[in-house]
């Protein structure tokens, strides 16, 4: 229609203005990385004018008649492809070792907590805080068990680690580009990242909610592009006046609403050395995580289900 033609031309003029303004900046003193950020922000702000029905819109009757397939399990009964899982615990509880065990075991086709055989997947472990010797200690322990278990079928280079204890900033174009190159190379089905607070930099006077929204948008775009399931390790806020800590994500409340599963790991008063697996919010998906993680003789963590993996247990 004539109105659509006018709208398209107006949209084109706005894009041309943004590009002209950005060309002037390119001749200035802006760092190339900063220039990319500026241009991306400006182009994102230019609203498009839809001229056709969205391809993913349909009548509910037609939509219900279409086949809808659940994504495959990347960790049987615990996590499907594309899911977002946030694990919250106090410092030193053992969540880093747990996520390390998940990444290493899943890469060799071993269930991380009941240690049964399962289809192997490529994994990426992004550690932004722990010292190398701590990672090496548990990494060698788990890897030796997996090598003995798999023998000649051990999948070398199936699990990658990005160890950057200085942290990174997912809102920084250079850091994001590094991650994109790594994801392109590894093609992981599972990414374990933590701790979350070291994956971005909040500048002075920046709002927690706005920062969280931007970081979540980056993570969602990467998930959609590369098709991985994401496990984030996060800290809980400090308790008031020495009181018991609420096991909810530190910082923005968006971290409570964003994940498909929000899990907690809390020290078990009745079982010293064990962690009770709980939840800080209702989940959008159904999965079967252990009810408790117990310290193992060989494996760092061994999962406990009161009714067994297929019996009655903690069914989120």
Q: Model-predicted segments: where are they?
A:
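DNA transaction DNA-binding modules
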Residues: 187, 307-316
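Conserved inter-motif catalytic segment of the P-loop NTP-binding fold
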Residues: 6, 91, 117-205
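Short, small/acidic-rich helices and loops at N termini and domain boundaries
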Residues: 1-52
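Phosphate-binding/switch region of NTP-binding enzymes
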Residues: 86-87, 92, 96-97, 190, ...
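The Walker A/P-loop phosphate-binding site
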Residues: 49-142, 149
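Amphipathic alpha-helical transducer elements in NTP-driven molecular machines
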Residues: 12, 72, 132, 136, ...
